[in-house]
Amino acid sequence: MESGVRILSLLILLHNSLASESEESRLIKHLFTSYDQKARPSKGLDDVVPVTLKLTLTNLIDLNEKEETLTTNVWVQIAWNDDRLVWNVTDYGGIGFVPVPHDIMWLPDIVLENNIDGNFEVAYYANVLVYNTGYIYWLPPAIFRSTCNIEITYFPFDWQNCSLVFRSKTYSANEIDLQLVTDDETGLPFDQVDIDREAFTENGEWAIMHRPARKILNPKYSKEDLRYQEIVFNLIIQRKPLFYIINIIVPCVLISFLVVLVYFLPAKAGGQKCTVSISVLLAQTVFLFLIAQMVPETSLSVPLIGKYLMFVMFVSTLIVLSCVIVLNVSLRSPSTHNLSTKVKHMLLEVLPQFLHLRVEPCDEGEETPRERRRSSLGIMLKAEEYVLKKPRSELMFERQRERHGMRREPDGYRADGFDVGVTTTLYRNLAQCAPEIKDCVDACNFITQNTKEQNRTGSEMENWILIGKVLDVLCFWVALPLFVLGTLAIFLMGHFNTAPEHPF
């Protein structure tokens, strides 16, 4: 009994499906028996067929700045009315709409005008829905690669305005009227790109700020021209700069800051200073090359990060130049340059006070630590002179009597055992009688004068080294504010470059 009921139920379902299929087939046969897909759905030649468009964005795939190409995944909704495709629902089993293949229908030939790959049509030709009232609804999906003029002035803090331009490639404004779809809630044209919230995938690099849509009539063309009317869908997108900040800007700023630290090296280490500065300069050149690979090859504008790299390269070049000058100053000597009093006063007295730098210049009349070390030579020479003038026997038995408790010399005697007057007379007689001793005295005087000259030369060379140190500090306090203020000024321009509040 149960098996019979099941068989009966299956037969009823099969009959209903066959009846429904036959009704749909009969309807399609009825509609398209005398249908001419090449003819416009208009009653007269002068009638204009309204065609509505709507764009639904499901994914902003990519914006290639180098190729100036926008890749999007969209659904293109196209609708119009065809009075030839009208039927009574009750005559065909209550069928209110029927899907039909696109190749047997009249289509308005709406294409993406600003495509980049020569593919003007959609990616997949879906079936067309035909309603009993003559309303035609077509929703084909597409992956469009369209052109987008890239403005790189504020890269990577930029925003772009990319557009998708649709027009008919067959019919002029006298034959079809392109319109935006009407919003069911407001009754006004839906003047923006729709976003499918369930299927939409957020892009990791770009944020959609505005998505307006509008119809544009080009008055410089006539209505017979296909370029007279077009529907433009705009995508105003703002770049998310975090990737570029972490991977390009921060390393570039840190490496560029190293060039300022060369002033902490000794003034005489000019070779190391130039090596560090030129190394940083080469690193900045590498960053500039990386930026050139990301942006389009255009001479209309320079990207913001490119401006910054040019700025720090200019500062680095100035620092290398200053290091060369400081090295030249630090290695000067009295034989090549004369240190004037005005220069010494300005660079070793006035300028250090302005820089809050403690500098003690070396004067010729003052005895520096180096001079004190050199003066020991004179003491040794005097000691040798004293030893040479005394007989060895006197040196051996000097103060012998005092050690054995005998009387001391009178107050008129010096500690070395000679009477002052007798010693003077003895020296005078020795000078007259011994030319060799006079030559020794002259040699000692020559050594003394030479030592003083060396001390004067050394003092002046130390002053040149101090001047180099002062110039290093001065250049540091000039380069550091220049670097910091230039960095802030350039990147703040990009920070305040945001998409407009209103698209138009």
Swiss-Prot record:
Glycosylation, residue list: N88, N161
Sequence ranges on the Cytoplasmic membrane side: 266-273, 330-473
Transmembrane segments: 241-265, 274-292, 308-329, 474-497
Localization in the cell: Postsynaptic cell membrane; Cell membrane
An individual GO BP term: chemical synaptic transmission
SUPFAM superfamilies in alphabetical order: Neurotransmitter-gated ion-channel transmembrane pore (SSF90112), Nicotinic receptor ligand binding domain-like (SSF63712)
Keywords of the record: Cell membrane, Disulfide bond, Glycoprotein, Ion channel, Ion transport, Ligand-gated ion channel, Membrane, Postsynaptic cell membrane, Receptor, Signal, Synapse, Transmembrane, Transmembrane helix, Transport
Major subcellular site: membrane
InterPro entries according to UniProt: Neur_chan_lig-bd, Neur_chan_lig-bd_sf, Neur_channel, Neuro-gated_channel_TM_sf, Neuro_actylchol_rec, Neurotrans-gated_channel_TM, Neurotransmitter_ion_chnl_CS, Nicotinic_acetylcholine_rcpt
Catalytic activity: K(+)(in) = K(+)(out); Na(+)(in) = Na(+)(out)
Record-level Gene Ontology MF annotations: acetylcholine receptor activity; acetylcholine-gated monoatomic cation-selective channel activity; transmitter-gated monoatomic ion channel activity involved in regulation of postsynaptic membrane potential
Signal peptide extent: 1-19
Superkingdom to which the source organism belongs: Eukaryota
Intrachain S-S bonds: C148-C162
Record-linked PROSITE patterns: NEUROTR_ION_CHANNEL (PS00236)
Bilayer topology: Multi-pass membrane protein
Gene Ontology cellular-component terms listed: acetylcholine-gated channel complex; neuron projection; plasma membrane; postsynaptic membrane; synapse
Extracellular side: 20-240, 293-307, 498-504
UniProt function note: After binding acetylcholine, the AChR responds by an extensive change in conformation that affects all subunits and leads to opening of an ion-conducting channel across the plasma membrane.
Subunit: Pentamer of two alpha chains, and one each of the beta, delta, and gamma (in immature muscle) or epsilon (in mature muscle) chains.
PANTHER family linked to this entry: NEUROTRANSMITTER GATED ION CHANNEL (PTHR18945)
Family: Belongs to the ligand-gated ion channel (TC 1.A.9) family. Acetylcholine receptor (TC 1.A.9.1) subfamily. Epsilon/CHRNE sub-subfamily.
Protein's UniProt name: Acetylcholine receptor subunit epsilon
Species: Xenopus laevis (African clawed frog)
Lineage of source species: Eukaryota, Metazoa, Chordata, Craniata, Vertebrata
